[in-house]
């Protein structure tokens, strides 16, 4: 596994214990980093880069979404890169923050007929790619990012989350 310095903050009841989340996220993000390094030639710093993960609730993520994106609604995941980086280029020593809302993850997992862990895995990979400069603001970007997500998730034994769907671009 690629080395990452993962910091976790649990701001809401209902999430697993910190040790459990850290092991789960380490496995998911480590596998994503290895795939990107080995298959996509993504460079990483020699020292393990830091990723901050915040596990919160819908109310908190709605406030953050309103403040930083001008969207006054809850969302599943928000990512805030510490430094601007282009996809495939060397990131800084601090990758940034990924914030995930428990209620939205639970609701979406139920609607998608997936386990909570499988959906959380997808959202962690999605957020991690944002920290590395990937985006889905237009169809070309979405195709690249969603392709990476699908290949990383396949390495983790999960199916294509976009199968049968149009590209998920967000304005």
From Swiss-Prot:
Cofactor(s) listed: Zn(2+)
GO biological process: rRNA processing
Annotated residues for binding of Zn(2+): 126, 130, 136
Main location: cytoplasm
Catalytic activity, EC: 3.1.-.-
Note accompanying the cofactor annotation: Binds 1 zinc ion.
Domain of life: Bacteria
GO molecular function, one term: RNA endonuclease activity
Pfam families tied to this protein: YbeY
Gene Ontology CC terms, in alphabetical order: cytoplasm
Compartment(s) where it occurs, according to its Swiss-Prot or TrEMBL record: Cytoplasm
Any coiled-coil regions, as ranges: none
Keywords linked to the UniProt accession: Cytoplasm, Endonuclease, Hydrolase, Metal-binding, Nuclease, Ribosome biogenesis, rRNA processing, Zinc
Annotated family: Belongs to the endoribonuclease YbeY family.
Annotated function: Single strand-specific metallo-endoribonuclease involved in late-stage 70S ribosome quality control and in maturation of the 3' terminus of the 16S rRNA.
Matching PANTHER family: ENDORIBONUCLEASE YBEY, CHLOROPLASTIC (PTHR46986:SF1)
Name of the protein in its database record: Endoribonuclease YbeY
């Amino acid at each position: 596994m690629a080395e990452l310095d993962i910091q976790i903050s649990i701001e809401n009841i209902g999430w697993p214990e910190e040790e459990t989340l850290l092991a789960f996220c380490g496995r998911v993000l480590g596998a994503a980093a290895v795939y990107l390094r080995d298959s996509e030639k993504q460079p990483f710093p020699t020292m393990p880069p830091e990723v901050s993960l915040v596990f919160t609730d819908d109310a908190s993520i709605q406030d953050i979404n309103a403040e930083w994106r001008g969207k006054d609604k809850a969302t599943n995941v928000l990512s805030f890169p510490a430094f601007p980086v282009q996809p495939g280029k060397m990131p800084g020593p601090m990758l940034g923050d990924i914030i995930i809302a428990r209620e939205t993850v639970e609701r979406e997992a139920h609607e998608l007929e997936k386990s909570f862990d499988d959906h959380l895995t997808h959202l962690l990979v999605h957020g991690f790619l944002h920290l590395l400069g990937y985006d889905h603001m237009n169809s070309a970007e979405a195709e690249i990012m969603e392709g990476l997500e699908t290949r990383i998730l396949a390495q983790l034994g999960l199916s294509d989350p976009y199968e049968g769907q149009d590209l998920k671009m967000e304005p």
